[in-house]
């Protein structure tokens, strides 16, 4: 991560399975994406309330992380970019398997960013894609194609 960041690459870290990270790592992370349990391991805060989420993001940003996304399952996600917080509400779906929801969220987030999409569109894409993935059984086969994701309703 340090080498990639120093070469000007945009670095994204999903610390799964979560474990404590060396302090020097944080300043080389442009975006960290964590779920609730990973958030607790990295910050000591299991995010139940909105204040918990804000405090956890404060801790990660104070350590040098550029942006933070905390996924909350059916509750959606909260993302902090350049000091501004964005809350995404997950669409209501008939979830049958959450195996690949987080990976789908991260993949869609990075895909949207790499395509040059605006932040709102990127977050909507990640939110909708991850929700859609939960309506299918399995891991890789549950990840939707871009044409399957409708961000107009997010």
Where in the sequence are the language-model features?
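Conserved beta-alpha-beta core of the PfkB/ribokinase-like small-molecule kinase fold
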Residues: 1-55, 76-77
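Conserved phosphate-binding/catalytic region of the ribokinase-like
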Residues: 3, 19-25, 50-154
């Amino acid at each position: 991560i340090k080498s990639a960041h120093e070469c000007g690459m945009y670095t994204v870290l999903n610390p799964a399975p979560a474990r404590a990270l060396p302090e020097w790592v944080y300043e080389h992370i442009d975006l960290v994406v964590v779920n609730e349990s990973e958030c607790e391991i990295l910050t000591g805060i299991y995010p139940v309330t909105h204040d918990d989420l804000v405090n956890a993001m404060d801790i990660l940003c104070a350590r040098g992380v550029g942006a933070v996304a905390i996924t909350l399952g059916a509750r959606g996600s909260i993302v902090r970019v350049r000091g501004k917080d964005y809350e995404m509400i997950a669409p209501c779906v008939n979830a049958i398997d959450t195996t690949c929801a987080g990976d789908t969220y991260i993949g869609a987030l990075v895909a949207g960013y790499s395509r040059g999409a605006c932040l709102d569109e990127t977050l909507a894409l990640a939110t909708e894609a991850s929700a859609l993935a939960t309506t299918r059984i399995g891991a890789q086969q549950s990840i939707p194609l871009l044409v399957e994701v409708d961000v107009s309703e997010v």
